[in-house]
């Protein structure tokens, strides 16, 4: 389902590499039509909201993979019009529709709609499931991320504070810890002069078994900060403390650092990082108008056991990928957490820009603040053959 792809807070299990061909994610016209027909049959028999949502999300996922963002977003929006009033009886299907609409809107530069739908993810759950649980916690984490991506640090902090309070009341100290770490990461981005780094440093020194998650998370975040500052030795020392206990084959590979990149002219007012776990989004200020329609690439690469990127290639793209050269160079320079085996990643990147209204007219136009939107596609496809052992030291 499309909503599984959109769950940025989830840790996705990697399958062991198997000797297969390069992944193929082309969605044929006939297959797309099959999804359209399935939704049409569902609506013709007046299917219940949960079946409507399932058929819609399956179509939207296929359309997204094929680069048909507008049709996918329109399909989800139509399902929301049919079902948004059914959240009390069908909270999860309606919430999933809002989640898909949020992601598609972000990739199309429809940031105002994306923000509204991000709130809808949580509100639909609250309407049908008053007692908050893991579903609400995930929605609150997502909402905080979208608020931060939009530069609304105070809103993101407010949502995370609410999550900490609610999670602790529910006995979920692990969720509260995750929210605390994310808030410190946001604080370090928005207010570098704050004591966020000092708090992270104190967390790294906690040795009680019950505080292992807090200590490990703080070390990972500090390692990212140190690498950004050119303190590679300090970052490596922190990672060595963590050890390889959680780096078994198939474990989630955490991004430790990535070189900054600029597509044209960097906008110094934009925040170009999010929650410390997903891939940074670079915002740029274009001095010339640009065409942001149908510009996306699917990038495949291996992460070697020592955490470096190998055998990177563009697996598929739309009609032009010249904009992506700085992005690809940044991906090649990434450092991930270590693991016992190489792991494969497949990622979608979309070149887009938000719409804005110009003084004196109600006609929205593209902003000159371009950006790249990201979505992990790894769980959808089997990996190709892993690189030879020599590739660990040779970065493509």
Model-predicted segments: where are they?
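Gram-negative bacterial Sec-dependent N-terminal signal peptides
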Residues: 1-19
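Charge-biased low-complexity segments
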Residues: 15-396
């Amino acid at each position: 389902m499309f909503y599984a792809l959109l769950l940025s807070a989830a840790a996705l299990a990697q399958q062991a590499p198997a000797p297969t061909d390069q992944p193929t994610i082309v969605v044929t016209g006939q297959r797309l039509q099959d999804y359209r027909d399935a939704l049409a049959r569902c609506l013709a028999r007046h299917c219940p909201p949960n079946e409507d949502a399932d058929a819609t999300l399956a179509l939207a996922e296929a359309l997204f993979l094929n680069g048909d963002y507008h049709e996918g977003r329109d399909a989800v929006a139509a399902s929301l019009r049919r079902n948004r009033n059914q959240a009390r009886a069908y909270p999860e299907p309606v919430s999933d529709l809002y989640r898909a609409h949020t992601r598609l809107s972000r990739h199309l530069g429809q940031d105002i709609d994306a923000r509204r739908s991000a709130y809808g993810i949580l509100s639909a759950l609250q309407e049908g499931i008053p007692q908050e649980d893991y579903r609400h916690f995930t929605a609150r984490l997502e909402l905080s991320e979208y608020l931060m991506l939009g530069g609304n640090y105070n809103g993101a902090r407010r949502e995370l504070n609410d999550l900490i309070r609610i999670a602790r009341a529910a006995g979920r100290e692990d969720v509260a810890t995750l929210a605390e770490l994310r808030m410190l990461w946001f604080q370090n981005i928005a207010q570098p002069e704050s004591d966020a780094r000092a708090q992270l440093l104190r967390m790294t020194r906690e040795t009680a078994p019950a505080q292992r998650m807090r200590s490990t998370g703080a070390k990972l975040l500090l390692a990212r900060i140190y690498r950004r500052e050119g303190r590679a030795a300090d970052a490596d020392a922190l990672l060595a403390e963590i050890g390889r206990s959680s780096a078994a084959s198939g474990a989630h590979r955490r991004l430790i650092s990535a070189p900054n990149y600029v597509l044209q002219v960097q906008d110094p007012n934009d925040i170009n990082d999010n929650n410390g776990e997903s891939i940074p989004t670079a915002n740029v200020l274009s001095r010339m108008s640009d065409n942001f329609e149908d510009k996306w690439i699917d990038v495949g690469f291996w992460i070697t056991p020592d955490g470096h990127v190998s055998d990177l290639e563009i697996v598929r793209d739309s009609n032009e990928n010249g904009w992506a050269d700085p992005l690809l160079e940044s991906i090649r320079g990434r450092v991930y957490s270590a693991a016992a085996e190489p792991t494969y990643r497949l990622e979608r990147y979309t070149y887009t820009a938000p719409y804005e209204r110009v003084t004196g007219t109600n006609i929205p136009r593209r902003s000159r603040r371009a950006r790249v939107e990201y979505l992990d596609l790894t769980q959808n496809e089997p990996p190709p053959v892993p690189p030879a052992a020599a590739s660990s030291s040779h970065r493509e």
